Swiss-Prot record:
Putative hetero-Diels-Alderase; part of the gene cluster that mediates the biosynthesis of eupenifeldin, a bistropolone meroterpenoid that acts as an antitumor agent. The first step of eupenifeldin biosynthesis is the biosynthesis of 3-methylorcinaldehyde performed by the non-reducing polyketide synthase eupA. Oxidative dearomatization of 3-methylorcinaldehyde likely catalyzed by the FAD-dependent monooxygenase eupB is followed by oxidative ring expansion by the 2-oxoglutarate-dependent dioxygenase eupC to provide the first tropolone metabolite, tropolone stipitaldehyde. The lineage of its organism: Eukaryota, Fungi, Dikarya, Ascomycota, Pezizomycotina. This is Putative hetero-Diels-Alderase. One of its GO terms (biological process) is terpenoid biosynthetic process. InterPro entries: 6-blade_b-propeller_TolB-like (IPR011042), Hetero-Diels-Alderase-like (IPR052998). Disruption phenotype: Abolishes the production of eupenifeldin. Residues 1-20 form the signal peptide. It comes from Phoma sp.
Length: 352
């Protein structure tokens, strides 16, 4: 068995027939796919966002906290370049989300080492902005806010009606030290951040549906988040659930707060994307597979483990649909391998 970290972007053709009714017997499953780009060993690609021009932006956690761009990803061999290194503020990046057109919030922190399983340094998480709106080829960047009370900032989602305000998921992982010594189950939480002023605050915590329980080992709870209309959706890596809750115009859950279980599947969720054609379908990355889930609770793996092609998906971390006429039916997936065994049926994920 080899041990290294390898990062990649995969492309999946998401046929509308599959989107409409994902079922285990669908003869389009597994979906057609191809490898779009693979970074050198030692690179950890964590999250993805799609620019208005269709280019992909991906964040890296190793060897440094950078944003990379995959240009015109619908091409056979797209150009890939680093567009910004955030080393002034962080060692690693995790989440990325678009606010205004071609403006993005990224989150990250200092870490004890560049090792893939290194712990973050306590009280060093922050939110930063990457701005292409003034120059589409050479973005500017700024620090929005230090968020020292946070633990492991993860997903970023803008409020659709106020895109300068974002919600950020926070995985309470007790690892702000070089060696983990406490595996007490811990709560997850969600922050709201005004990107104009840098003001932030907690909007949701102390709910079992957000929490880390370590049911699957030293894993995290709440992970990727998305907002559609006034519904906040999230995945919980630890308890296998996809959830949603109503939020108000300030991004605060509407009382009485009772998170709704949308769907459940025995996997380790990481992130999700809304279907561009069918509001009843969510796409999500899990343990070495991509899944399609309906809001009435149906879930089916569409690529990777659980289909006839178990070797497609090594450690997927995030996914996003294309935004142009050329690729609006294409799902782009980032992935990492931390431990590379002979079979992906037992692979260990390399993402948060």
């Amino acid at each position: 068995m080899r041990y290294h970290l390898s990062a990649l972007v995969l492309v999946f053709t998401a046929f509308r027939e599959t989107l409409t009714a994902p079922t285990p017997g669908n003869n389009t499953i597994p979906l057609p796919n191809r490898l779009l780009h693979q970074w050198p060993n030692g690179t950890w690609v964590e999250n993805i966002s799609v620019r208005p021009n269709g280019n992909l932006l991906v964040t890296t956690s190793t060897p440094d906290g950078s944003v990379w761009q995959v240009k015109e990803p619908w091409k056979e061999n797209p150009e890939v370049e680093r567009v910004f290194n955030f080393d002034e503020w962080v060692d690693r990046l995790i989440g990325i989300g678009e606010t205004q057109d071609d403006k993005y919030v990224v989150v990250g922190s200092r870490f004890y080492s560049t090792d893939a399983q290194s712990s973050h340094v306590a009280r060093t998480f922050c939110a930063m902005e990457l701005d292409f709106s003034g120059n589409t080829t050479e973005p500017s960047a700024r620090l929005i806010a230090w968020m020292p009370e946070s633990y492991l900032l993860q997903g970023v989602a803008a409020l659709p009606w106020d895109r300068d305000t974002v919600l950020i998921s926070d995985q309470y992982v007790l690892r702000p030290r070089a060696v983990q010594i406490d595996w007490t189950p811990s709560p997850g939480q969600i922050w709201v951040l005004d990107t104009r002023t840098g003001e932030y605050g907690l909007v949701m915590t102390d709910y079992a549906e957000l929490n880390t329980t370590y049911a699957k080992g030293p894993d995290v709870g709440i992970d990727g988040i998305k907002i559609r209309d006034h519904d906040l959706f999230w995945v919980n890596q630890d308890d296998s659930g996809i959830y949603r809750v109503k939020i108000d115009d300030a991004g605060v859950p509407v009382a009485p707060v009772k998170p709704q279980l949308v769907a459940s599947y025995n996997t380790m969720w990481d992130d999700m994307a809304f279907d561009p054609f069918n509001e009843n379908v969510i796409w999500a990355t899990g343990l070495n597979a991509v899944f399609a889930a309906t809001l009435d609770g149906q879930i089916v793996p569409v690529d990777g483990v659980g289909t006839s092609d178990n070797l497609t998906l090594p450690g997927p971390t995030a996914c996003a649909f294309g935004r142009t006429e050329k690729d609006k039916s294409i799902l782009y997936v980032t992935g990492n391998l931390l431990t590379v065994p002979e079979s992906l049926l037992d692979v260990k994920l390399g993402g948060w």
